[in-house]
């Protein structure tokens, strides 16, 4: 995703300058990595202040899943119908767009799929007095089912705007309702900003801000590197520490 255009002179110059100084992977720290991570974290509300740098959106969502499962010591995830989060095996399991598509084998028992919050063709439409809350309660129903299962509830992952689902803007109160229920049950809330982050929604820098919520984990990709292999996961110190230990 060439977020600021192909061959943008500032991007080209920054890349040229850095390749002339140092070219290494993110396993080894150097000042530019730290400086970038600090600037990136500065764009998020507290307590989102820990940054993990990776190479692709799939890696970011894979790491987010591992963080949630490590923190909660549970495996189960609630996902949104037609959602897409990546192409690794575990992410295909979380992506109805893939596992319910051609050649797909459906979701495993540890994954529950909640209806897409579509006000045009969905279960609850614009005529409903509060469709966002109604859809959010559906998320909670699936979360309760997981919490009472052998898998347990690790969390809920949702794109801040449903991309492959048809560029569906989430209805008001959807994430507020869903997040409150997920957290009450001990799960974590993951905002997938891989496709829509970095100001692509217009009004705000991050899509989740349109819903007036603060996720526990945010994943970034595509526009972050303007087409170059860069992605990130932003989370809290508490969640990061649980993963490190």
Predicted features along the sequence, with ranges:
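Conserved N-terminal phosphate-binding loop of PLP-dependent enzymes in the Aspartate aminotransferase
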Residues: 1-245
